[in-house]
Amino acid sequence: LLGLVPKVHIPNYGEFYELRHFTPGNAEAEDVWVPEEGEDGDYINFGTNLLFTCEELPGLAVAAEICEAVWVPNPPSIGHALAGATVIVNCSASDETTGKNLYRESLIGGQSARLVCGYIYANAGEGESSQDLVFGGHNIIAENGTILAESARFTSETIYAELDIARLVGERRRMTTFQTNVSSPYMEVGFHLKKEETELSRYV
């Protein structure tokens, strides 16, 4: 377990009533004690301002935002990208309403273009609907404005795609208007990824 990223934007409009049960988490990263069975436990990085950097692949830096965060006027992913994140991941529970899938696709694609990043969006799906909300499992992988992979709704489909991290880093370097300007402190958390020869599904 590398870190815990809390939800900071709690919707309380339309069909959402999350403020009845939850309060927003903190952005600033800190160490929190997470107990385990018996007397064991460990300190875990907790907060939204966490940047997970790969030791073996320079340029691969991952940050997370949760669900509603990508829909707000100033998403956390903006700060993540300016702090150096090249891949944004989002665990979401976005319900299905008329036309919302098209809006969702446009939103994720647009955010990946604006931030010159890869954006991996995983949505609630099979077995998670209730009498109040229906979740279609609409998953999306986007890169710099291009939808690389997208699941069909109401299926248990696994999607995958290759993200060209070197291209993203190069594109950011080329754009004189894309400057890293971190307004709040981030905690870097290193992780390891084994390099393996992989057959690609796209030209990179």
Per-range role (PLM):
Residues 1-204:
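Enzyme catalytic cores with a strong preference for nitrogen-chemistry domains
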